[in-house]
Structures are given as C-alpha cells and as structure tokens.
C-alpha cells in the first residue's frame, strides 16, 4: 500500500505567538490551527500522513509540536527548531532527537539579518550532532540565500537537506533568473532535495486561479526537471496556503501538482512525489498504514 504524505504543514496557537508571525492583518491564518482543522482536508485528499514543521524559532514551540504529534496519528514526523550556534547545541539536538517523531531541524534562515548565516564553521558541531541522530535539515530560504546554502551543502555532503517551498522564487514578478541557475547548482548535489510547496502564495494571492496557475507552472516544471522523481516531495504549506484561497484550496493545489507532475515526470513518479520520497527522507514509520 502506497502511503500519501503531505511533507509540509503547520499547527499553531495564536495566544502563544504574541508579536510573532502571522500578523493580525493576515486574518485568514491569524487564529489557532490544529489537527481537527486539517483532518477533513486530509480525508478528502486521501493523505495518510503529514510532516509537521515549526514556524517559530522557539524550543517551547517545538516541544508543543512534539507533544501534539505524540497524540496525533496522522503526524509522521516533526521538524523542529534548535539554536544551532548555541554552545550546547549538541545537547539540545540530542534532547530533541529523543522524541519518537523528531526527524529534522529548521533554522528560520529567511528571517535572519545575515544572508550568509548558514555558511559558518560554527555550525559544524551542530551538524555532527544532527548526523549522529539521523536528523534532516529543512532550509527555509529565499533566492538571496542560495549561494550560502550551496557552500553549506558542499561542506556537509552527508547531511540530507531539503529546500522548503522551492526557495520562494519571485513568481509574481515572473523572474526565473537568477533563481533557476542557483537551483540548478544546488540540484547537482546529491544530498539536496526540494519541496513542491508554498508556490501559490508567491504568485500573487489576489490573482485568480487561471493566472496563478499560469504564473506558477514554469517554476513547478523547473523543480520537476531539476530534482526529478526521487528528490522532489509535495507539501501543502497549510494553513499558509489559505492566503492563496482565491486560486483554490488544499485539494486544488494537490490536484494541480499531480496533473503537472504526471505530464512532466510520468504517472509512475507520482507515488514518490506524493509519499515515497518524503517517507524515505524523513524516515517515517508507515507501519500503521500497512495493517
């Protein structure tokens, strides 16, 4: 039985995020979101398992997600946050990795003032600890970070890395370059993977569905071509996806990606793109789906 996996979604409690993202003006997502909100969407889309990803640079928030995952059968993996440059980073990583569903870490690179923060030998100790505990690295980056990410990935060739949201290209402006060239360099490294997620919200959320899909399609095609059928994984980025509600919802984004990827990579690739690749990357236990 093939398990279908959403490789990128969030849960949060607004009351615990005072002064943090998402701001109140984003009323579509400025409220609590938990498993009961996502469950009907998963059922309708026949998604079995999700990867729950942090959205605050906070160990308290990460603990909340780990506790929630322990009580939520549909969560197969948690990507959390640890200060990777802390003096005791190795101990913090070990504590995180002790949780049954802990599978990866994500520094919020897009929000840091230094675009080259990741290209730093002070991360070597943290990366060694991640490798010791078989953790993956989620790269929340934008085009301006890609040179530094390339240097980091070359320095740590044994570390499995996945680029979130295709590195958030400037889809609304129609800029393929220099994003495409930078992504091609990254895709040449075998430890680099990519999430097919978050693109509709980069395409101009107020645009209608036809325009958004037309704007997005060249970027989806590029990612499919660069990372192929084994290193690309679909994710919803829910509930952030709600910001692009003018062009559709959870099932619409899934269907659009299925149609496009079947056209460019072939129907045989869909099991990997929509489940198998994320399962292998995050070492997700699928035993409950095999019963």
Write out the residue ranges for each language-model feature:
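Mid-to-C-terminal alpha-helical segments outside catalytic/metal-binding sites
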Residues: 2-5, 23, 29-49, 221-222, ...
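Active-site phosphate/pyrophosphate- and oxyanion-stabilizing loops and adjacent acidic/basic residues
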Residues: 39, 63-67, 94, 150-151, ...
